[in-house]
Amino acid sequence: PPWLPIGLQHVPKKTWRPPIFGTGTFGRVHLVKEKAAKNYFALKVMSIPEVIRLKQEQHVHNEKSVLMEVNHPFLVKLFWTSHDDRFLYMLMEYVPGGELFSYLRNRGRFSCSTGLFYATEIVCAIEYLHCRDIVYRDLKPENILLDRDGHIKLTDFGFAKKLVDRTWTLCGTPEYLAPEVIQSKGHGRAVDWWALGILIFEMVAGFPPFFDDNPFGIYQKILAGRIDFPRYLDFSTKDLIKKLLVVDRTKRLGNMKNGANDVKQHRWFRAVDWDAVPQRKLKPPIVPKLCSDGDTSNFETYSENDCETTSPVSEKDLEIFKNF
């Protein structure tokens, strides 16, 4: 839209609210208000020295390039990026409902119909990304936000990657890593379908299928592939999860020749009108409580790191981000 800010002067620092939530160790997200149009945005502010120290340069560039390319109702929108000699800035749409993670923890677990609603929207988002040769690689409840109506928005595209061939880096959250990622066999679209299986299990059971006190223990359980289902889960729910959590990725649902259609045609989704899903026509099971457009009560607020203590970086380091 034409009213979007061209420079940070349009988002004066005094209009920044306290950070909404941390984005790892090198970034914070602020709620900002565009004065003239009174629109709220999320401004992600990342410390360049920290990004470099943690070797996250590629992830930051990936996030920008992927978000600039996509446009889908279930993916968070990026409007503008910029940088100065200390920080990188990404101005994104503000999604006020908070993380799916919070709702799941508050309820303990979701009913099958609630889990199914979120799964349908996530399937559409994954299918859209995969059609563009993008692997998301970080599907988990913390990265799924709810908009004001209760529909999903995937956020945090730092691990997302445009596929040229199978990729080889180990990234993601231990409980959600696919076997081929742990075994360094290279991984493509199949990792997102594995993560969907983990997510559906966690939504309807209240805990992930593979967990342990340390990552190595989790990895062993993932590779063994044994799933203990709670007794109350019905056959079709268990069947879908089993077919998504197949260790051999060539036999994993979603990763065979019919791609996402195999997932969409599974009996668990038999009542779903797939054309209606991306049009946001399905009725959300949870509608976030909001008092106003700029309400941040669905997020935990974090104390402000003192941005002023971040030193400017050298010209050489700044060169890495010249196109940001």
Q: What is each model feature region?
A:
Residues 28:
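Conserved N-lobe ATP-binding subsite of Hanks-type protein kinase domains
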Residues 40, 45-71:
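Conserved N-lobe beta3->alphaC-helix segment of eukaryotic protein kinase catalytic domains
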Residues 80-81:
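A short, aromatic-enriched beta-strand patch in the conserved N-lobe beta-sheet
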Residues 86-99:
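Conserved short submotifs of the Hanks-type protein kinase catalytic core
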Residues 118-119:
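Activation segment signature within eukaryotic-like protein kinase domains
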Residues 249-324:
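C-terminal regulatory tails of eukaryotic serine/threonine kinases
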